[in-house]
Design a protein with these regions (language model features):
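Surface loops and adjacent helix of pleckstrin homology
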Residues: 25, 38, 57, 91, ...
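Short acidic-glycine-tyrosine-enriched beta hairpin
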Residues: 16, 58-82
Length: 104
């Protein structure tokens, strides 16, 4: 069986140094992110959008095993612990944007 290749946690890397990696996620309505694993704790700040979903992979472990849908709250910041293999899906009618700060 071929080894699975995972993508990035967001669509564009903005900055990386010895302490953080800062990413931008930008998804058009109906678009999906790369399937990715969160190997670091991170802070997620929603910027724009109306509905977002996370679809876990079958081998995702811990608290990250259920499909979730959520309303987007622009300006809302959340601290999230590492773990999970997922794909983000913009299930809304508006463009979805977020900033994701991985903590090293």
């Amino acid at each position: 069986m071929a080894e699975r290749v995972l993508g990035n946690v967001a669509t564009r890397l903005l900055l990386e140094n010895e302490r953080v990696r800062i990413w931008a996620m930008d998804l058009a309505p109906g678009a999906r992110s790369d399937t990715h694993r969160h190997d670091a704790d991170y802070v997620l700040v929603q910027i724009e959008g109306d509905r977002i979903a996370a679809m876990p992979e079958p081998d995702s472990a811990g608290p990250y095993t259920a499909y979730i849908e959520a309303d987007v709250v622009p300006g809302k910041a959340r601290y999230i612990r590492r773990g999970g293999i997922e794909t983000a899906i913009n299930i809304g009618e508006r463009r979805y944007r977020e900033i994701l700060v991985e903590l090293k």
